[in-house]
């Protein structure tokens, strides 16, 4: 049985880890290298590193910061933000990332996923999808540019297209739940796992061990990602894993 993964997320803005609510109101959390090391000591399964302002400010991801983090941690590292080309992917993988995450650029040009998968293998290519529930259309809508821009695209449809293009994994964030600590969007992740056959990392809304238990008992996602609860010490990775083990969910 495949074990479920618990993944802290480092949202990095100008070299500092930040965390906001619904993608705004950013608070400073600290130095990414120190925080990454702390998560490694806690037994996190992987780490996601997102340069949250890279795409919006049209600059490359902070390769030096990625290198510094990769030198200190030995768990798989996924890096995203500002990736516009295969050359950008190569630079990050060379800097120590195990996987690269594409969001806005892939929506604009899905062939980037294909090119990356052909060069580095599907397992290294993650499509990140930020989505909001659109009640009047009865669907999840894709957003880009760090959640600032809505796109006329159904998130479930885009998930299928991204996988067909070459994504070996999806990192899906509920913008409605992000930072609220009110629980994962179970409906979203149920729809996604029914639609695609690749591993899905669920993001947005984690607030308690119960939220992780519900995520893994009510959906078939592969991983749960969180930032706020871990950064501010409300929960530790071992506490989450203990609760999951008690609920008979397989974890490392």
From Swiss-Prot:
UniProt entry keywords in alphabetical sequence: Amino-acid biosynthesis, Cytoplasm, Histidine biosynthesis, Lyase
Keyword Metal-binding in record: no
Superkingdom of origin organism: Bacteria
Subcellular location: Cytoplasm
InterPro entries named among the record's database cross-references: Aldolase_TIM, His_biosynth, HisF, IGPS_HisA/HisF, RibuloseP-bd_barrel
EC annotation from Swiss-Prot or TrEMBL: 4.3.2.10
Biological process per Gene Ontology, one example term: L-histidine biosynthetic process
Pathway in which the depicted protein is active: Amino-acid biosynthesis; L-histidine biosynthesis; L-histidine from 5-phospho-alpha-D-ribose 1-diphosphate: step 5/9
Catalytic residues (positions): 11, 130
GO (cellular component) term, any one: cytoplasm
Catalysed reactions, semicolon-separated: 5-[(5-phospho-1-deoxy-D-ribulos-1-ylimino)methylamino]-1-(5-phospho-beta-D-ribosyl)imidazole-4-carboxamide + L-glutamine = D-erythro-1-(imidazol-4-yl)glycerol 3-phosphate + 5-amino-1-(5-phospho-beta-D-ribosyl)imidazole-4-carboxamide + L-glutamate + H(+)
EC supergroup of this enzyme: lyase
Gene Ontology MF term list: imidazoleglycerol-phosphate synthase activity; lyase activity
Assigned protein family: Belongs to the HisA/HisF family.
PANTHER family recorded: IMIDAZOLE GLYCEROL PHOSPHATE SYNTHASE HISHF, IMIDAZOLE GLYCEROL PHOSPHATE SYNTHASE SUBUNIT HISF/H IGP SYNTHASE SUBUNIT HISF/H
Subunit structure of this chain's protein: Heterodimer of HisH and HisF.
Role: IGPS catalyzes the conversion of PRFAR and glutamine to IGP, AICAR and glutamate. The HisF subunit catalyzes the cyclization activity that produces IGP and AICAR from PRFAR using the ammonia provided by the HisH subunit.
Protein name: Imidazole glycerol phosphate synthase subunit HisF
Organism per entry: Lacticaseibacillus casei (strain BL23) (Lactobacillus casei)
Lineage, broadest ranks: Bacteria, Bacillati, Bacillota, Bacilli, Lactobacillales
Gene name per UniProt: hisF
């Amino acid at each position: 049985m495949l074990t479920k993964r618990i993944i802290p997320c480092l949202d990095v803005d100008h070299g500092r880890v930040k965390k906001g609510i619904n993608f705004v109101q950013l608070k400073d959390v600290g130095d990414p290298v120190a925080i990454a090391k702390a998560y490694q000591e806690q037994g996190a399964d992987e780490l996601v590193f997102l340069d949250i302002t890279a795409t919006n400010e049209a600059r490359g991801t902070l390769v030096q910061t990625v290198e510094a983090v990769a030198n200190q941690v030995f768990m798989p590292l996924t890096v995203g933000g500002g990736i516009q080309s295969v050359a950008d992917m190569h630079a990050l993988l060379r800097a120590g990332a195990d996987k690269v995450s594409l969001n806005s650029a892939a929506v604009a040009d899905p062939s980037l996923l294909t090119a990356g998968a052909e060069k580095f293998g599907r397992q290294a290519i993650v499509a990140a999808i930020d989505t909001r529930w659109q009640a009047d259309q009865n669907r999840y809508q894709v957003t880009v540019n760090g959640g600032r821009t809505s796109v006329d695209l159904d998130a479930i449809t885009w998930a299928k297209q991204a996988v067909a293009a070459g994504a070996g994994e999806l990192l899906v964030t509920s913008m409605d739940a992000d930072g609220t600590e009110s629980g994962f969007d179970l409906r979203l992740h149920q729809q996604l796992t029914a639609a695609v056959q690749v591993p899905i990392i669920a993001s947005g809304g984690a607030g308690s061990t119960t939220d992780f238990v519900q995520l893994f008992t009510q959906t078939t996602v592969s991983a749960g990602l969180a930032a706020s609860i871990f950064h501010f010490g409300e929960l530790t990775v071992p506490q989450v894993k203990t609760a999951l083990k008690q609920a008979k969910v397989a974890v490392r």
